[in-house]
């Protein structure tokens, strides 16, 4: 995997190439962009570039160091995360900062990757700050977050931010054609619009649309029929779900509503249910519902309980 594997983002890639040519790849990067924007792809490329032993452009993608990075088997790439915890435990951060002073096993750098840096609490960020300020020569931090503002200003000021951008329509469409050769082009184009130009998001939309969740089918029926009592019957059991169970349901509802809205502008609906929504509800209703679910997904990432979120949606989606 070379830098060219990151689609679009030409300005960002030129900047990285210039830093590399000058030997100035920093010790702290902040990679920002929404889920599906390519943050994780860029992180893998950066890890490989920093460990690559080939002359010329790095990463070469074929040397032993690159292969280990790309296979997820490099001993000097440390992922700091606990997917089962909403907030990254401070102990994990402290352990990483202690481990930082043990020299690399075989690589040129020891890289600490934080795939959910936005889920570091203030205490964890302050612990990390001390190591980011004065790392050993081989120490490197890669922090991934949706927005730079999710981290403390003191952290941001010590990192080089690399912001991922949406792909040009032609680039995105070409990539989707390669990945979904049997899907009609109008459907690919509609997925790209709904994804805001981000490849990973568009791929998720196309995969998720292959099957409608039971809660989504029930939601469409209740929403199109304007029956609040039916909507309550859909949302009430969802109040008992865990956050990770509720998120894909609300994400699919959002996708259905967005497709319904864009179909009013001439884009083909991704599912028949989207056309049903577009026929049953006016644009103002659909727009309000999209905003309600956007806020619900935002609250889901905060401290609001699934019960409170579903209760609010019972009122907002009538």
Model-assigned labels for residue ranges:
Residues 1-49, 65-68, 137-139, 146-252, ...:
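Charged, glycine-rich active-site and insertion segments that engage polyanionic ligands
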Residues 2-123, 127:
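Clamp-loader machinery-focused feature within the broader ASCE/P-loop NTPase space
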Residues 116-120, 132, 148:
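Conserved Walker B
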Residues 126-143:
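Conserved catalytic/switch belt of AAA+ P-loop NTPases
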